[in-house]
Regions:
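N-terminal binding-site loop/beta-alpha segment at the start of enzyme catalytic domains
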Residues: 1-87, 150
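Structured C-terminal cap/extension of enzyme domains
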Residues: 15, 51-53, 58, 196-388
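Structural motif corresponding to the early beta-alpha repeats
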Residues: 66, 82-101, 126
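Short catalytic-loop micro-motif centered on adjacent basic/acidic residues
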Residues: 59-66, 155-159, 181-182, 255-257
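Alpha-helical structural signal in soluble globular domains
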Residues: 51, 55, 74-82, 114, ...
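Local beta-strand N-terminus motif with an aromatic residue
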Residues: 23, 60, 86-87, 117-120, ...
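A general structural detector for well-ordered alpha-helical segments in enzyme core domains, enriched
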Residues: 11, 44-48, 71-78, 107-111, ...
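Glycine/proline-rich, positively charged
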Residues: 36, 96-214, 226-227, 234-235, ...
Length: 388
């Protein structure tokens, strides 16, 4: 097995069964690098990245669109300090911009230049949902991945995902993927691909990288209600380390991506990963996380279990569970993150809440008894500015 940047204190896992590489169980998510005056603070960002690499991290995740390209440029700058051949770089293709075959080439070559690399180690189709998956197929992204792998400019091919489990299965089965990237955390382990997707992909030999381990920062502590923060303190449980350990306690993920923006966050996470292993989560930690998880479930605006029973009855194809997940997350983090609105905008017109014709056919299929048409009006108002 190949291993880069080995350090005894870091823990490593194989990326699936196809790659033959060992990846640090903690990876750097380069979407939330240190900022100053609305732009990435390059000096602090490079120092942060080098602190992680010095601790044995060998996986950095970025994307074409992060910080309007500045994230990739800063990662390239950090790697120029002697790290280029010691670290795996993952970046992503903006699939939503792919209108026809060949559209992949310009952004890909821009990424090579930004990252100062001749080959991308881990390359992903970015944010696949139903709409973006269709664009990927129509623009022949899979064939393009094959060609670039043959040329040696992409080593491993994967995708990141934001939709439901059934589509996730379809995508996993459609291509010989080396790895994938999913949202996964203790607060909502069933959302999107979820635990089922984690096990499904892993069972196929596909490596699974985990993003959003802290639910967009919500699980880090400050955004939790006071009683939850007090509970963590009284039980001697760290909200961040326990959330990470919850994921590392499971054998399937090969890396957990943390969007660290401060050096102390990096140092804390490096300390936590030293003891990461399957089954490492203590019963004390588990009991606290279960209570916090219960609170989140009870206080999300829409008590949707994402069972999907409503979907077949919809005459226009509104993606009800996906919409409710986006709405819940957006409000739980008090509208502080741009990802839910961006994902909403990327959906097909007939999938959006505004496509609902208010026929009510879905209501009789909902085990939770939700007023689905009423909630869809609220989702429309939230993401499209139309009155409910």
């Amino acid at each position: 097995m190949e291993i880069l940047n080995y350090k005894p204190a870091m823990r490593y896992r194989p990326c699936g069964s196809k790659t033959g590489v060992l990846v640090s169980m903690l990876g750097i998510g380069a979407m939330r690098l240190p900022m100053r005056d609305g732009a990435i603070d390059e000096a602090r960002a490079v120092e942060l990245i080098e602190t992680g690499l010095g601790g044995g991290i060998n996986y950095i995740d970025t994307a074409y669109v992060y910080n309007d390209g500045a994230s990739e440029r800063v990662v390239g700058r950090a790697l120029s300090n002697g790290w280029r051949d010691k670290v795996y770089v993952a970046t992503k293709l903006p699939v939503w911009d792919m209108a026809k075959p060949g559209d992949q080439l310009a952004p890909f070559e821009t990424q090579l230049a930004r990252l100062q690399k001749e080959r991308i180690d881990f390359y992903l189709l970015h944010a696949l949902n139903k709409r973006n998956w269709k664009l990927a197929l129509d623009s022949r992204c899979l064939e393009w991945l094959d060609e670039e792998k043959r040329r040696g400019r992409i080593r491993f091919a994967g995708f990141s995902f934001h939709d439901d489990f059934e589509l996730f299965k379809e995508i996993v089965d459609a291509y010989d993927w080396d790895f994938c990237q999913i949202q996964y955390n203790y607060a909502q382990p069933e959302i999107q691909a979820g635990a089922r997707g984690l096990k499904y992909a892993s069972g196929k030999g596909v490596g699974v990288a985990v993003m959003e381990p802290l639910f967009g920062g919500f699980l880090a502590g400050p955004q939790l209600p006071p009683w939850a923060s007090l509970l963590f303190e009284e039980r001697g449980v760290n909200p961040v380390s326990s959330a990470l350990r919850w994921i590392w306690s499971q054998p399937e993920p090969f890396v957990v991506l943390s969007g660290m923006s401060e050096k102390n966050q990096m140092k804390d996470n490096l300390k936590t990963v030293e003891t990461a292993d399957v089954g490492v989560l203590s019963e004390r930690e588990r009991s606290v996380l279960e209570r916090v998880c219960l609170y989140i479930r009870e206080h999300v605006p829409i008590a949707c279990s994402t069972c999907g029973y409503c979907l077949k009855s919809c005459p226009v194809g509104v993606k009800i569970p996906v919409l409710f997940d986006l709405y819940n997350k957006h409000l739980l983090v008090e509208r502080r993150h741009t990802l839910p609105p961006a994902l909403y905008r990327s959906m097909l017109p007939n999938e959006k809440a505004s496509a609902c014709v208010q026929c009510g056919a879905c209501k009789k299929h909902c085990p939770q008894g939700l007023d689905i048409p009423g909630w869809l009006l609220k989702v429309t108002a939230e993401f499209e500015g139309k009155k409910a």
